[in-house]
């Protein structure tokens, strides 16, 4: 099973590599074509797309969990297919409701929240309404993708994500070079959602066709709606806590200033998204093995070590070389205010990568209610941290608030998983100790050291993580049956 998860993870990483490369090339072109202010609006539009987990009311994730667990228990594929297509129809219907809501709210967002006026306001309003029109298509696509993940078709997903990533960034770049109007650029981004839907529905019809005369079980539909209902709470609060900072900053500062925060944030998430993408292969595997604690233990032990040996060197290198990387990629004037923001966010991104593991474990066991309740607990804490941080430290304070919130989230998720999963307690405790050690090393290298000593220790740590990764690969070769523990 661990080899299968590793294989799926590698395909996920391959697809994400293409997306990362396209994004790194596209953002400087968009900055040159649109300017910092319009680029800030474009990143806000990307933030709205990030709320797709809210728009689908948790049903795409529910499909992943239901399909994985049902097929793992030997359920009929025809019954599973009937449920899947029923839920995708519901998603498209919900999308129409969200379309109307965003269309109606767009003027308020532009004038009150973003505080835009004149030509910029007109362009942004057009772009937001174009984005609204794409929501039903986007939600149907997320349902199909969630099902394909439940079928563990990660190779197929990655192969098609590669050209779609080129389209997602390439089309807005072409439009920006022809006509630097942010409205049309966002409209081009929205158009790619329609293509996504057509692609994924065709693939799903090929792999899991709906058979005439077979209807979805009411119990299965009720389970999916219950799971998705609680998950929608997390999907409301989770993206809100991820993206609320940029919208709060947009209400206080001009778009050019917000870009000093949003561009480092998007850069950091993309630069470290490869290991996180690999971790997404863990969720359906955990759902499939929920009745076998020993298999879940091996999967989680491997995943915790993978987070450390893959994510830690990535965030460490980017943090140490943050200023020169930003200066070369964008320009020196942009790198100055953006560097401390990027370094703080990287700590949070490492912790967030680690938090994905207990989050996936709890949801794979059907406990989306627990993750939702934890997010409800964190929301007021984050609101206080964000307001206080921005008041005292500006955009750097927003980065600090986000990182502190992520640290709290990780601590609560690991504690909850430890409390709920008795067979996994020892492994989880060892994993938390390893993660705390990794955080301490990051803080020491980035903030306490400088000059040749900082560079030397960074090199040693990266080499150590690389050797550890090779050791893990050796242990998971065919014919090797050693159990990996943190």
Task: Describe the function of each predicted region.
Residues 129, 158-206, 227, 376-382, ...:
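Hydrophobic alpha-helical transmembrane segments
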Residues 106-130, 301, 318-350:
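Interfacial segments at transmembrane-helix termini and the short loops linking adjacent helices
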Residues 126-129, 378, 427-483:
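Transmembrane alpha-helical segments of multi-pass transport proteins
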Residues 57-73, 149-150, 208-209, 264, ...:
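Helix-loop junctions and terminal segments of transmembrane helices
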Residues 1-5, 182-183, 198-242, 281, ...:
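Interhelical loop/hinge segments that connect adjacent transmembrane helices in multipass membrane
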Residues 4-69, 95, 99, 103, ...:
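Signature of the first transmembrane helix
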Residues 135-161, 178, 183, 204, ...:
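Membrane-interface junctions at transmembrane-helix termini in multi-pass inner-membrane proteins
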Residues 1-23, 78-89, 122-124, 152, ...:
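N-terminal membrane topogenesis motif
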